[in-house]
Swiss-Prot record:
This is Large ribosomal subunit protein bL25. The keyword Ribosomal protein applies. It holds the Pfam family Ribosomal_L25p. The gene is rplY. Transmembrane segments: none annotated. SUPFAM superfamilies: Ribosomal protein L25-like. It comes from Methylobacillus flagellatus (strain ATCC 51484 / DSM 6875 / VKM B-1610 / KT). Residues 186-207 are annotated as: Disordered. GO terms for molecular function: 5S rRNA binding; structural constituent of ribosome. Part of the 50S ribosomal subunit; part of the 5S rRNA/L5/L18/L25 subcomplex. Contacts the 5S rRNA. Binds to the 5S rRNA independently of L5 and L18.
Amino acid sequence: MAITIKATKREGKGTSASRRLRRAGNVPGVVYGGDKEAVSLEFNHKELFLEFRHETFHASILNLEVDGQKEQVVLRDYQLHPVRNTIQHIDFQRVSASEKVHVKVPLHFINADIAPGVKLAGGIVTHILTEADVSCLPKDLPEFIEVDLSNLEAGHSIHLSQIKLPNGVEFVQLAHDNDAAVASISKPRGGAGAEGEADAEGEAAAE
């Protein structure tokens, strides 16, 4: 079920007006895109933050309700206070059912515990990317993408081109010939062979 966020049109603009909004517990924002003009908005911070803190809010089609009228949007940008971690400003972009959107989608890594590089070699998994930019129609937008590490060996990486995507979804980076590494498994320091040699040397010294 799509998340619905409520807003009202914002009359005052500029730094002073935005400060007054924040002091009153609200967040200045804007919605733009499509064949409509940009509209300045204000949101109740408490209500907005309850949804904002969830991962799905950042990578899904949202219902934006402004003065009773709903339209579909995606989160495009936001600013957080460096100390209080409150939302200072937020931007949304309108979407059309017939036009592709570019959205950063979270990567969920699975089966790391059974990867040969971990289970057999004792390697350590490193997540190089935690999200990736995808292109698709709004109806095909996934909330997250699974990255299966079950066959990954120590000393190797898994790249975008090796990840299975839902139908209709593609990685933007691959369209620009950038097959970025997503995760890797580093070999244990010294390696199993080195440990064996060390044990043998210790036994010889004891004799």
